[in-house]
UniProtKB/Swiss-Prot annotation:
This is Tauropine dehydrogenase. Optimum pH is 8.5 for the forward reaction, and 6.6-7.3 for the reverse reaction. The half-maximal rate is observed at 6.8 for the forward reaction, and at 5.5-7.9 for the reverse reaction. It comes from the Eukaryota. May play a role in maintaining a redox balance during environmental and functional hypoxia. A methyl group in the beta position may be critical for active site binding of the keto acid. In the reverse reaction requires NAD(H) for the activity but not NADP(H). GO terms for molecular function: tauropine dehydrogenase activity. InterPro entries: 6-PGluconate_DH-like_C_sf, 6PGD_dom2, NAD(P)-bd_dom_sf, Opine/Lysopine_DH, Opine_DH. It comes from Arabella iricolor. It holds the Pfam family Octopine_DH. Keywords: NAD, Oxidoreductase. Its EC number is 1.5.1.23. It is an enzyme of class 1 (oxidoreductase).
Length: 397
């Protein structure tokens, strides 16, 4: 029997709770600290089944009717005796959960970020201290599914499941109950297939969302004349060749960071930092109709169809870009800024990453880069290694 604790109460937590509860030899608990989510979920399950509806192209939907054993707001109830803890909340909430979990986590526990986002392991090391070294940490670059809650605490829809998902593992000094990759694969079932390789630092260098979303925002809006547009532009399927080239350049800079680290520390494997083009082909093998380039991969990915730039409506019915959402608020401080902080330590120039951060920080009213150096006053609100006092390669490896 594997005891799984899921942290969070959103789309991903609902989905994992339903899917994992359907797997054999699995005790599933949900710990949600947000507002009254636990109470609402418990109340719903008193009178309703919990249904996970899985969709797949060309097949009838599959309805899984299962319930987690426990839903709670109490960290002691949720975490005591857990073999594996999966954190599904956004990066800004990780510290709250890690702090609440710490007194109740046993050495040998597997801690998983779904996705952990860049700096996940830095946050764990800072908050858990020696306990972090005794636990196995896993970080994945994305969520396994496209999913949405249909009715809170009652049903969730899995609109698409990735074929493969990439991640990395750092083994702790105390062995887990079983192989950590096999353990989390057992929670998910056969798909997505989990591929874990390379050093955990690679997951912080290869900030997929941190590269993708700010690059697309920069390409579309950096020279905007301030005039409202008639409709929100398509986000992915409106990507220009120039935008794809910028994203490719940013991706190449992350590969250069990885190579620079490996040059200085023999034996550190950062081959898990790959270009965005092969990443997309691996992540969406059946959704992309033209895989010939990064530009075509994004523009012909069926999963991106119809998605638009975040915009707000003006009084006269037109639209202006909204720079207050997660594409900046999460993907810069918990994404691209982390990558840039690692580059600073490695001594690797990143002109394209710098260009995007310098543009974004003005719109955000933040300061990360000053005169080309990663020394701004708002680094303390990021997950860059410098925020935690990690300023050498040895401290982040």
């Amino acid at each position: 029997m594997v005891v799984l604790t899921i942290c969070g109460g959103g789309n991903a937590a609902h989905t994992l709770a339903g899917i994992a509860s359907n797997q054999p030899n699995m005790e599933v608990r949900v710990l949600t600290l947000y507002a009254d989510e636990a109470e609402r979920w418990i109340k719903s399950m008193e009178t309703n089944d919990f249904t996970t509806i899985k969709y797949a192209t060309g097949k009838d939907p599959v309805h899984l009717k299962t319930k987690p054993k426990l839903v709670t707001k109490n960290p002691e109830q949720g975490a005591t005796g857990a073999d594996i803890i999966v954190i599904t909340v956004p990066a800004f909430a990780h510290a709250q959960y890690l702090t609440a979990l710490k007194p109740h986590v046993k050495p040998g526990t597997v801690v998983v970020g779904f996705p952990g986002q860049p700096g996940f392991d830095f946050e764990i090391m800072k908050i858990w201290g020696d306990l972090a070294k005794q636990c196995t940490v896993m970080n994945f670059v994305s969520l396994p599914w496209a999913c949405r809650i249909k009715e809170f605490g009652k049903s969730v829809e899995v609109l698409a499941t990735k074929d493969m998902m990439f991640g990395s593992v750092r083994n702790g000094t105390v062995a887990p109950k079983m192989d950590p990759t096999a353990m989390i694969q057992g929670c998910l079932g056969p798909l997505p297939r989990l591929e874990c390789s390379g050093h955990l630092l690679g997951m912080s260098i290869m900030a997929v969302n941190g590269m993708l979303h700010p690059s697309i925002m920069y390409n579309r809006w950096h020279d905007w004349d301030g005039k409202p547009v008639d409709a929100p532009p398509l986000f992915y399927h409106g990507l220009s060749q120039a935008g794809a080239d910028l994203l490719s350049d940013v991706s190449n800079e992350t590969i250069a960071i990885a190579k620079k680290v490996m040059e200085q520390r023999q034996g550190v494997d950062l081959s898990n930092v790959i270009h965005m083009h092969p990443y997309y082909i691996g992540a969406y093998p059946d959704d992309i109709s033209d895989k010939s380039s990064l530009y075509t991969c994004i523009n012909t990915n069926a999963g991106f169809k119809g998605l638009t730039h975040p915009c707000t409506k003006t009084a006269d019915g037109k639209f202006v870009p909204d720079f207050t959402g997660r594409y900046f608020g999460e993907d810069i401080p918990f994404g691209l800024a982390v990558t840039r902080g690692i580059a600073e330590i490695a001594g690797c120039p990143t002109p394209n990453i710098d260009k995007i951060i310098e543009w974004a920080q003005k719109l955000m009213g933040k300061e990360y880069l000053v005169g080309g150096k990663f020394t701004g006053k708002d680094i303390s609100a990021t997950r860059a290694p410098q925020r935690y006092g990690f300023n050498t390669l040895d401290s982040i490896l």
